[in-house]
A protein has these predicted regions:
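Nucleotide/phosphate-binding catalytic cleft detector across ATP-hydrolyzing
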Residues: 1-87, 103-104, 215-228, 332, ...
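Iron-sulfur cluster-binding cysteine motifs and their immediate structural context
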Residues: 403-419, 433-452
Length: 454
């Protein structure tokens, strides 16, 4: 239950029609639009190593970039049944979003980047044991650190203004990095403590020290604000295309892992959801939830196809949209140059774009699930710490400086005897940050040259 590109590559369907929007663009390039309807296929025929007769269920896309994952987001959250104006967003790297105004649905994808998942952040990591996932205010800021069961527990209590650890917590000494939700909390804390001014952290060393050597700096906050800015510009653009004001939008649905675990109040404060939204619903991994529903009841595919056919969607390609371009330029000026929100609104008003209001009051937050995967089944969850595979290889020209090892945020990489590169595949599959490759001073490290070993 993935996005159109994922499912198309998986099924062997050409993806060139996804690169361009509109019939004219396709016609000019001789591109044929592909059908991505629901279907039941042979799992063996698509290359899966399973027994003959095993069936593969593929849910439908709606159109263009609006894939099965976006349909799941709308279907499982209750978004489609909502009578009031409402917005739903999957808070991940691609930030799929949809705005419902009556029977009309406006969709887009903001390509927020990896900061939402803890990547491109110096101490960033994916959610796992030892990750700082939140900061909770209790007169000082308490770091929330994920334990071995991925449950947030109290870490150290920090005074960012005085730049001291006020008190050690039960998770002292166990923090290894910070997740995307932790970064959002840190950005909110920096703003609350008036430490983020004109695009810089106003601390003695330009860093916000959390615990156990984990920190975020001005560059990290700027990266996070770019991701936040992309999402805010996306939401803003959908409202402008729909012709409604922020004051007419109150209901927000948050999906995805980050949408489940992030503090929704802090998220609204920093701009991850519209400031007018005072009724917030947090859901889990809606794609996995819908996939589970299909496995339990394969006939659901027919219902989902009917829903997909009936959605009147207006898809906005943000990459070529003038409204998005105008708003995102202001977002970049805010995070890179410290431009004031007054100037932000003034610049947008000059081209007829409505004002971005300030958040008012405390929103009502409905946490619909406690985990992004709410149903763990009869056997519960078990974290497999060794999956038995590694990536290994030698790089011609490697000088053994171990810079790649030092830069790996997941502690997945080691430089062994003879400068052999060893990567634990349980921690890294080479699809996220590429810090190892970028950090190589001789530019000889190539992740793709590593070979899988058992």
């Amino acid at each position: 239950c993935g996005n159109p590109i994922q499912l198309s590559l998986f099924q062997g369907i050409p993806v060139d029609d996804l690169a361009f929007a509109g019939e004219n663009a396709h016609k000019a390039r001789g591109i044929q639009e592909q059908k991505r309807d629901a279907g039941v296929f042979s799992a063996v025929d698509v290359g899966l190593n399973v027994k003959d007769g095993c069936e593969l269920y593929v849910p439908p896309s709606i159109r263009h970039e609006i894939g099965a994952d976006a349909l799941a987001m709308m279907y499982k959250s209750g978004f489609l049944e909502q009578k009031e104006n409402c917005l739903v967003t999957d808070y991940g790297t691609n930030a799929e979003m949809a705005l419902k105004i009556g029977d009309e649905i406006y969709t887009g994808s903001a390509a927020a980047g990896p900061a939402m998942e803890g990547q491109s952040i110096k101490c960033g990591m994916l959610a796992g044991p030892g990750a700082i996932s939140d900061l909770e205010y209790d007169f000082k800021w308490v770091c929330k650190v994920l334990d071995d069961d991925i449950i947030p527990k109290d870490g150290d209590k920090v005074d960012f203004g005085l730049e001291i650890i006020e008190e050690n917590g039960p998770m002292h000494g166990k923090a290894k990095g910070i997740t995307g939700t932790g970064v959002i909390a840190a950005v909110a804390a920096a703003m609350d403590d008036h430490l983020w001014k004109k695009g810089k952290l106003k601390t003695s060393d330009g860093k916000l020290h959390l615990q156990d050597g984990v920190y975020i700096d001005s560059h990290d906050i700027a990266e996070a604000l770019k991701a936040i800015g992309a999402m805010r510009a996306g939401h803003f653009t959908l409202l402008e295309h729909a012709g409604i004001k922020f004051s007419e939008l109150d209901i927000m649905y948050m999906a995805g892992a980050s949408g489940t675990y992030v503090d929704a109040v802090k998220a609204r404060q920093v701009g991850l959801l519209p400031p007018s939204c005072n009724t917030i619903y947090q859901y889990g991994n809606t794609s996995l939830a819908m996939a589970t529903d299909i496995l339990k009841d394969p006939e659901l595919l027919d219902e989902l196809q009917d829903i997909a056919n009936g959605i009147r969607a207006n898809h906005i390609m943000f990459a070529g949209d003038k409204i998005f371009e105008q708003i995102y330029m202001q977002e970049l000026a805010v995070c890179d140059e410290g431009m004031s929100m007054e100037m932000y609104n003034k610049n947008n008003a000059m081209v007829g774009i409505q004002e971005l209001p300030k958040p008012k009051g405390t929103p009502t937050v409905h946490r619909m699930v406690q985990r992004d995967i709410p149903d763990l089944g009869e056997r519960g969850m078990y974290i497999l710490h060794d999956i038995g595979t590694e990536l290994r290889g030698y790089m011609d020209g490697c000088i053994g400086c171990k810079k790649c090892e030092q830069e790996c945020p997941e502690h997945a990489l080691t430089v062994a005897d003879g400068n052999e590169i060893v990567v634990k595949t349980k921690n890294c599959l080479g699809t996220a940050c590429y810090r190892c490759q970028f950090s190589c001073p001789k530019k000889v490290y190539k992740y793709d040259n590593l070979k899988l070993t058992f």
